[in-house]
Amino acid sequence: MLKTGKSDSIRLYPTKKAGVRRPSTLHTRMHRISLASCPAPSCGYGVVPMALAKITQVSGRAVFIPGADIDTDRIIPARFMKCVTFDGLGEFAFYDVRKNEDGTDKPHPLNEERFKGASILVANSNFGCGSSREHAPQALYRYGFRAVIAESFAEIFFGNCTTLGIPCVIATTEDVKDLAAAINADPTIEVGVDLVNERVTYGDKSIPVTSTASARDALITGHWDAIAELLEGKEAVDAKMKELGWA
């Protein structure tokens, strides 16, 4: 059962024009949702599942990648986007800030052994700004991330994550700061993203988070992949084509 909660304001950053990063406030109705598991993304490449999993909760260890305005080129440099499929993009996530020209490691949270295997990414404001490349969330997913917690997101990046089944939730600056401190103090701490109760939990702490109603509804009902939805309606599409004389 879906329960309607209070109206909230969510800060997203639209990226309609290259180089423009102006804040926007989207007023949305919040919904409370029910529990399920995390699937692999289909994204129109390879086999598309006919029934997508409902995603309402993600848990695991987390890593904090500091800095506002982390753009998609930093997440996945453009030279790695020549691939025919998205397979293998994970190893190039944050490549230019993780690696020197000779391939040796730079100081970076993702290079620290204590954060290996982290499945939840924590970030600051305007995460995923810049170009709208869908390779960025693909690289994050294939690196192993299953959810992102940030102060705010670029609008197109947020949508691209949703269509991959990656929940993006927004927390206050202070709550992100406290969460990051807890993660850095104890990298083994489990972080839970609970879309049912709109909370993020870690240790004995629980903080409120928000998202957009459309993204949350898509995730919790298992309708976050448009191609899979289209394939589920194949019989209806075929019937309409016959009706119109196209088949």
Give the label of every model feature segment:
Residues 3, 21, 48-49:
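N-terminal non-cleavable signal-anchor helices
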Residues 44-247:
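Fe-S-dependent hydro-lyases/dehydratases of central metabolism
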Residues 1-10:
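Extreme N-terminal basic, low-complexity initiation segments
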